[in-house]
C-alpha cells in the first residue's frame, strides 16, 4: 500500500502522463468540471495506473469532436510506445482502425467473420468477407463525384434470439447462394495472414456468380 500523500503524488503523475495541463488542480476537481476530452484522459490514466500489458479501449473516441479525437488517439499511440502496452480497440469507426490498428478482427452477430492485418484490410486485396466489403464501400471518399450516393448494406442486423440458419450475414448479402442459407461457414485461412468466414471469400469468384 501507500500513504495518502504518496497516492496523491501518483495521481498527479499519472494525470501528467496523459498530458493533462495543471494536473495538481485537476486532481481535486469533480468529473462535471472537466470537458469530455479531459474525462477521457482521466479514464486512460486510471486504466494505465496498474501498468497493464493489455488495455481494452471500448469506443474510446465516441462523442468526441474530431480535434479531441485526434489528440486522444495520438496520446494512446504515444503511451503504447512508452509503456509497451498492447491496445485492443473495440470500435465501429473505420478511420480509427486505419490509424491505430496493426491487426483487425471484423465481427458480425457475435462472430469473427474476418481477421487480417490492417494494411491488407484497407487495400483492394484478393479476398474479403462480404460484410467487410460492404463496410469499405460505405466510406466517404474525396474522389466520389458530387451527387453520387454512398453504398449501404441492405437490411439490418438480426435479433440475437432469432439468428438465421446458415451464414448469419446471408439475408443481407448480395452474393448469397443457396448453400449460404443452409450451411454455416467456418473461419478459414485464405492466405498466411488472413482468415475469412465465407464460402466465397475470393472477390472475383463471387462477383462472377452475380452475372
Listing of model-derived features with the role each one plays in the protein:
Residues 29-34, 38:
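Conserved ABC ATPase signature
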Residues 118-211:
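Charged, flexible cofactor/metal-binding loops and thiol motifs
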Residues 25-30, 148:
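Interfacial catalytic loop of ABC nucleotide-binding domains
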Residues 5-25, 133-137:
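Conserved ABC ATPase "signature" region
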Residues 49-53:
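A short, proline-enriched helix->beta-strand linker immediately N-terminal to the Walker B motif
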Residues 56, 60, 64, 68-148:
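P-loop NTP-binding/switch modules centered on Walker-like glycine-rich loops
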Amino acid at each position: 500500500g501507500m500513504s495518502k500523500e504518496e497516492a496523491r503524488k501518483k495521481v498527479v503523475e499519472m494525470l501528467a502522463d496523459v498530458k493533462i495541463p495543471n494536473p495538481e488542480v485537476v486532481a481535486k476537481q469533480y468529473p462535471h468540471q472537466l470537458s469530455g476530452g479531459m474525462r477521457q484522459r482521466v479514464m486512460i490514466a486510471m486504466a494505465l495506473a496498474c501498468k497493464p500489458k493489455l488495455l481494452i479501449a471500448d469506443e474510446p473516441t465516441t462523442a468526441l469532436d474530431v480535434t479531441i479525437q485526434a489528440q486522444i488517439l495520438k496520446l494512446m499511440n504515444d503511451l503504447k510506445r512508452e509503456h509497451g502496452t498492447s491496445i485492443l480497440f473495440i470500435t465501429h469507426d473505420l478511420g480509427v482502425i486505419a490509424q491505430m490498428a496493426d491487426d483487425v478482427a471484423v465481427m458480425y452477430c457475435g462472430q469473427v467473420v474476418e481477421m487480417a492485418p490492417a494494411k491488407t484490410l484497407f487495400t483492394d486485396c484478393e479476398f474479403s468477407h462480404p460484410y467487410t466489403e460492404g463496410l469499405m464501400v460505405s466510406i466517404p471518399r474525396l474522389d466520389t463525384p458530387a451527387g453520387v450516393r454512398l453504398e449501404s448494406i441492405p437490411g439490418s442486423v438480426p435479433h440475437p434470439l432469432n439468428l438465421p440458419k446458415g451464414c448469419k450475414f446471408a439475408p443481407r448479402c448480395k452474393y448469397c447462394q443457396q448453400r449460404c442459407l443452409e450451411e454455416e461457414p467456418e473461419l478459414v485461412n485464405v492466405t498466411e495472414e488472413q482468415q475469412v468466414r465465407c464460402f466465397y471469400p475470393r472477390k472475383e469468384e463471387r462477383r462472377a456468380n452475380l452475372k
